[in-house]
Amino acid sequence: MAGAKEIRSKIGSVQNTQKITKAMEMVAASKMRKSQERMAASRPYAETMRKVIGHIALGNLEYKHPYLDERDVKRVGYLVVSTDRGLCGGLNINLFKRVLADMKAWADKGVESDLAIIGSKGLSFFSSVGGNVVAQASGMGDKPALSDLIGPVKVMLQAYDEGRIDKLYIVSNKFINTMSQSPQIVQLLPLPPADDAEGVVKKSTWDYLYEPDPKALLDTLLRRYVESQVYQGVVENLASEQAARMVAMKAATDNGGNLIKELQLVYNKARQASITQELTEIVSGASAV
């Protein structure tokens, strides 16, 4: 059994670590609330934009934009949103497993994949497993701006425009609540119909009026749509990251408390054994006299 002094030193080390994890938990909780506010502010715009684009995809357009046309799939692209920092539980690895599973499903059909990575953790992982990373962005901090994401988005849109990829997906964590975040894969291109758009179009033959003309409007609008969906994915992933980190740090703090209790019991036993030995030596010495 370890000596009382050594055990006392271990207890002190665990207590110091516990203070750090508790502080990190509180910081993550504060950042999560701010991320939730940012996510809530951008979500209505992203959802409305998606609904409008869904109606356009089912409408009777004079000009059929390439982003609305299905085509034979020879190669797919993924915009993968990960984190720049760790200590957030299984948030990243669960997302990466989802991407790999989807890539394998396409590979079984003879379709290859390109990756544009947002976040250093994703870049590190997919570089290590041999993924074809064609663009990356990292170091966006706690307040990501759309300008930080333009690089990877532009690369993937250009690849789609030139026919080098035939489908484009965004992969990110959807924030459900503080305790639950779920990896999701959402198709960006070609534009999928909105969830309720098909039923609306079946009941009515209405369409939008375009000014000055459909091509000029759609060329800009559809790119803004993709950018808005990517930005929304990033802010939701950031909220998910902070929530996962808060939960992970709370678990670490609680585990530290349990470990301290166990070490305290061991320390008490060691101290008791030491006292018993000292008493035995005193009694033995007295008997010898």
Curated annotation (Swiss-Prot):
Primary location class: membrane
Database matches in InterPro entries: ATP_synth_F1_ATPase_gsu, ATP_synth_F1_gsu, ATP_synth_F1_gsu_CS
Membrane topology: Peripheral membrane protein
Keyword Cell inner membrane: yes
Biological process (GO), any one: proton motive force-driven plasma membrane ATP synthesis
Name of a matching Pfam family: ATP-synt
Similarity section: Belongs to the ATPase gamma chain family.
Quaternary structure (record): F-type ATPases have 2 components, CF(1) - the catalytic core - and CF(0) - the membrane proton channel. CF(1) has five subunits: alpha(3), beta(3), gamma(1), delta(1), epsilon(1). CF(0) has three main subunits: a, b and c.
Protein name: ATP synthase gamma chain
The encoding gene: atpG
